[in-house]
Amino acid sequence: MYLMYTINENGDRVYTLKKRTEDGRPTLSAHPARFSPEDKYSRQRLTIKKRFGLLLTQKPEPIY
């Protein structure tokens, strides 16, 4: 089981262990992604994400 969260109507995080909320929306993982300082391909990964508009700064804010 992983700690998950959802954002309520006030914009606060509500933590849970469930994969979906009561109204069927998926919850988000509360754990950060794994990181390795020896990542050989980070430059290429960022280049591809920039090219296809997949960076979080290039996406609109999610509507909950």
Curated annotation (Swiss-Prot):
Q: What is this protein called?
A: H/ACA ribonucleoprotein complex subunit 3
Q: Where in the cell is it found?
A: Nucleus, Nucleolus
On whether Cell inner membrane is a keyword of this UniProt record, the answer is no
Q: Which PANTHER family match?
A: H_ACA RIBONUCLEOPROTEIN COMPLEX SUBUNIT 3, RIBOSOME BIOGENESIS PROTEIN NOP10
Q: What is the stated purpose of this protein?
A: Component of the box H/ACA small nucleolar ribonucleoprotein (H/ACA snoRNP) complex, which catalyzes pseudouridylation of rRNA. This involves the isomerization of uridine such that the ribose is subsequently attached to C5, instead of the normal N1. Pseudouridine ('psi') residues may serve to stabilize the conformation of rRNAs. Required for ribosome biogenesis. H/ACA snoRNP complex-dependent ribosome biogenesis is important in female germline cell differentiation during oogenesis.
Induction field: Repressed during starvation.
What's in the GO CC field? box H/ACA snoRNP complex
Recite the UniProt keywords alphabetically: Nucleus, Ribonucleoprotein, Ribosome biogenesis, rRNA processing
| GO molecular function, a single term | telomerase RNA binding
Instruction: Give all cystine bridges in this chain.
Output: none
Question: One Pfam match, by short name?
Answer: Nop10p
Assembly description: Component of the box H/ACA small nucleolar ribonucleoprotein (H/ACA snoRNP) complex consisting of Nop60B, Gar1, NPH2 and Nop10, and associated with H/ACA-type snoRNAs.
* Family per record: Belongs to the NOP10 family.
- One of the protein's GO biological processes: rRNA pseudouridine synthesis
**Upper classification of the organism:** Eukaryota, Metazoa, Ecdysozoa, Arthropoda, Hexapoda
* Disruption outcome: RNAi-mediated knockdown in female germline cells results in a cyst differentiation defect that prevents progression from the 8-cell cyst stage and oocyte differentiation.
